[in-house]
A protein has these predicted regions:
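Q-loop/switch helix immediately C-terminal to the Walker
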Residues: 104, 111-125, 137
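ABC ATPase NBD coupling module
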Residues: 80-99, 125
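Conserved ABC transporter NBD signature motif
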Residues: 67-81
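The feature captures the beta-strand-to-loop junction immediately N-terminal to the Walker
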Residues: 44-46
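Conserved ABC ATPase signature
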Residues: 155-161
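Conserved ABC ATPase "signature" region
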Residues: 133-152
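Conserved structural motif at the start of ABC-family nucleotide-binding domains
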Residues: 9, 28-30
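ABC-family P-loop ATPase nucleotide-binding domain
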Residues: 1-21
């Protein structure tokens, strides 16, 4: 793909399989796409076609039964990310430069945890120098989403927020 330099995200030949009863079951067989900066991309397909597997692969949250067989992912200005589980770049990218919105957002949030806890769980693997620095990122993210009172939102439970 020669468009990757102007892309926000470039995925090349991503192959993912699941292991079930000691058998390898391919789910993604060489998916490739480019998402240009400022554009929106939607993955459409029937149930079981690999949409969620693709998204989970990109943010590194596949279940233990899944394996990324091969592929490359480039973020932003052509930064190469080895999509193996051991790549340290995942920690600096996941949750900060890429994320996933679940089909049913109500199921994605634990109702007994505050929004602050959800943020902290997402950011816990990031190299923050202090808890205050991590909190600043939480506040900044909420301000980007046009929340006027980030402190109130962080202390709220999912059911206390509307929309």
């Amino acid at each position: 793909m020669d468009n990757y330099l102007k892309a926000a995200l470039s995925v090349e030949q991503l192959k993912v399989s699941y292991v079930q009863n000691k058998k390898r079951l391919p789910v993604l067989d060489g998916i490739s796409f480019v998402l240009e900066k400022g554009k929106i991309l939607a993955l459409l397909g029937e149930s079981g076609s690999g949409k969620s597997t693709c998204g989970k692969s990109l943010i590194g949250v596949l279940p233990p039964s899944a394996k990324i067989d091969s592929g490359t992912v480039r973020f932003g200005n052509g930064d190469y990310v080895d999509i193996s589980d051991n790549d340290i770049n995942w920690k600096t990218i996941r949750g900060m430069r890429i994320g996933m919105i679940y089909q049913d957002a109500q199921l994605a949030l634990n109702p007994v945890k505050t929004i602050r806890v959800h943020f902290e769980e997402t950011l816990r693997n990031k190299p923050f120098p202090s808890k205050e620095a991590m909190e600043k990122v939480c506040y900044d993210m909420l301000r980007l989403l046009n929340f006027d009172d980030p402190e109130r939102v962080l202390n709220a439970y999912p059911f206390e927020l509307s929309g």
